[in-house]
Structures are given as C-alpha cells and as structure tokens.
C-alpha cells in the first residue's frame, strides 16, 4: 500500500515522463518539417537508382531485385609466394562459381582522400606532462610531410555487393542472408574478413560519394516524422548530366566514368594496385554477372565452330597458294587452344562464364583537376596494355 506522499511522487514522475515524451515528439515533428523543407528536389532524389534502403541493410534496387553488401579487408596477395597466390586465386574462383545466373556480384574499391587536418588530429602524438614533447612535435612534423608527399592519407575501402531476384522482401532476405554467409566464409578462407553492412552504413558510403566532406546525421526514426525516404538524406543538392561531354556534376563535384574497353587475354593483378595508388577520389566497380552454364557452353561451342571454319578457310587458301596448310595465323591457333581448354574446364570442372564490366569513376573540384586524374587512370591502364574509354 502506498502512502499519499508516495502516490503523489509517483504521479509526478509519470506526468514528468509524459511531458518529456510529448516534448521529444514535438521536437521530432518540427525536425521532420525542417527536413522536408531542406530536402533536395524530387528530380535529384529520383536520379538515385534504387527504391528503398532498409535498416537491416537490405536494398530494393528495382521491383523484384534486392541486394546486400559486406566490407572486406585486404588480402595479402601481392606479398604472398606463388603457391599461396595460386591458393587464393583458386578460392576466389570458387567464390565466383558460387553465384548463379540469377545473381550479380559487384566488387567496389574506393579511394578517398582524407582531409590532412582531420588526419593529423586523429593520428598525431598529443602533448603530455613530461620531457618528450619536443620529440612528439618532431614525429608529428615527419608524419605530416609524409602525408603531404605520399598516399598515406588515402583511405582505401573494399566492398562486395551481391544481388538476387525475389518475389518479395522476405524471400529476398532469406536467400541473400544465405549468400551473405557464403561470402563471409569464402573471404575468411582467402585470409580476409567480411563484415555485413546495415542500412545506415550503406547510406553513409553513398553519402561519402554523393556529398564528399559532409557528415550524415540520420536515424531511421526520422523518416516517420518527415515522411521522406532515404533518398532525401544522401542526394546532393543537384545533378547536372549536361555539364560537358561524358561528364556530370554532383553538387560542387565534377565526375566522369570510364570503362575498360580493350585489354589483353590476361590482366595483370597490378592494374588495380596502380589505380588505387593515384592520389585522388576514385571508385572502381567490377560488375560480374554469371552466364547460365547451358547458354555459356553454347556460346563457346559457337565461337569454336566459327574459328574452325576460319581454320579450314585458311588451310584451303594455303593449299591453293602452295603453302603448308598446317601453318596457321598464330592468333587463330592460340584462340582455338583457349576455346578447347575453356570447354574442357566447363565440362570437367563445372567452371562458368561471366559477363564482366570494369568501371572507374573519378571526381574533382574542377574540370582541370578531373582532366589530370583521368589521364593518370588512362596511363595506369596503358602500363598494363589496357585502354580505358569514356
């Protein structure tokens, strides 16, 4: 039994709690109203090519198409011996073969320059009440010089995004969670770690690209009061896709996307390293779509058939001209051997074909700055017999 004093105290606490709750709700409603007022234009928001980003990290890209992302750590491939490199490559091939033709996987490698002042604040040695502050100042000076002259201040991040078709969100969640578990296991076997991203983290990544230098202040509860979507919090102030030929602007940033057009039969594993050594804001996107095994087999057999016909034509020409019919153009012989090897791998080892698109997006404050970055990207490609085009 409560005394009157205790009951009065309890009622006072309830009243105080109720007032605080109402005040908080009023504040959130006012904030939501302000967010609606400050939101980017609808046209700008609609330029972001996805439908919804859910709090658990599931993204609805298009009707019936869903994706999830994981952050991956570096794999010590370059410094490994050949046997270990071969083992990593085999496990990577197994990882890719784990996707079917209803899936798409994208590997993103992001170069982002840190603000030097912020970088020094985070890493410099702070003064302490001892006799070593002069040494700390000297170390900070050396660190700053290295940051300004090298790529120490570059933040390099790597992500894997995988996409699947599904009838609804729940089915997508079930299948993508299974895929996610396989991805995490695969990268663990390669000596890496894979950390699933929630919705907020994926929005923060998009925000860093679309609004460089800004900090995303966002909570999913905000959407209840503003009536907006996640598009409103990451969209830049504007998009201009008519800025210049092959270029567009996002807010105050000028951007351009290049694609890998020509490349040798085998691309050096140093290409990505050279690209990420460029001191600039860059994003590499490698989009990988598995081709249905039956369709892939027919494609290779058809290609092989065309080359065999070409071989027969070349032999017939040689015989008419009095040459040895077994002497064929080197590239034709090599292509036939490759087609035969590929067919054998597909039949015996269940290997599959992939449709791959290699993209690089560069950003700069001005067209002149972007020109310099684009030239560095193209130069990196030329060093490996690759051509990047607009």
Give the role of each language-model region.
Residues 1-390:
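Extended, folded cores of ATP/NTP-driven motor/assembly subunits in large transport
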